[in-house]
A protein has these predicted regions:
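C-terminal catalytic lobe of FAD-dependent flavoproteins
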Residues: 87-171
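Active-site substrate-recognition segment that forms the wall
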Residues: 1-116
Length: 171
């Protein structure tokens, strides 16, 4: 984007890592058919059935920059998921993975037009999959100059992409 991002992190984004697990349900067990979301001792845990007979369990949040899953994260996710869905202890463990989600200093996403031809929509942290459709719709409307459309106006001023910027984009 005209060199604005070269060698810099002007938006103050940080990687928030999350461990996630995959299990395989044995054929003799009835698989769960709905997403299960819960809190165990103030920790969020979710169990997601997949069409291939596997289950995804997630996810932790950490900012330690380790590349792989943490033993503590794997242990905590398994323990919490089994407390919520006890039959999981009979599943086959397939893998533990880690991914990075972009976070902002105040954990609010960046969503806004910063100049003609440049709309920023990022920093959704652990809610990215939930807010992706909203971010895409509003981002497209901002880029096309049609926001707000259909009489639906949501105040997105708190999501100003430049609120933490270390540099100003060229105008």
């Amino acid at each position: 984007v005209d060199g604005w991002f070269e060698g810099a992190n002007p938006l103050a984004l940080r990687p928030v890592l999350g461990d996630m697990l995959r299990l395989r349900v044995p054929e003799e067990l009835a698989p769960i058919t709905r997403v299960v979301r819960a809190f165990v001792e103030d920790r969020p845990v979710y169990v997601i059935p997949r069409t291939d007979g596997t289950i995804a369990i997630g996810a932790t949040s950490r900012e330690d920059n380790r590349k792989g899953p943490s033993v503590d994260g794997v242990h905590t996710l398994l323990r919490d998921a089994i407390r919520v869905v006890p039959g999981l202890e009979d599943c086959e463990f397939i893998e533990a993975i880690v991914g990075a989600r972009p976070g902002t200093p105040d954990d609010l996403p960046y969503l806004g037009k910063v100049r003609d031809g440049l709309v920023i929509s990022t920093g959704y942290f652990r809610h990215g999959i939930l807010l992706s459709a909203f971010g895409a719709k509003v981002g497209a409307q901002l880029g096309l100059g049609t926001y707000p459309a259909n009489g639906l106006e949501i105040d997105i001023s708190a999501c100003d992409p430049l609120r933490h910027a270390r540099y100003s984009p060229p105008r």
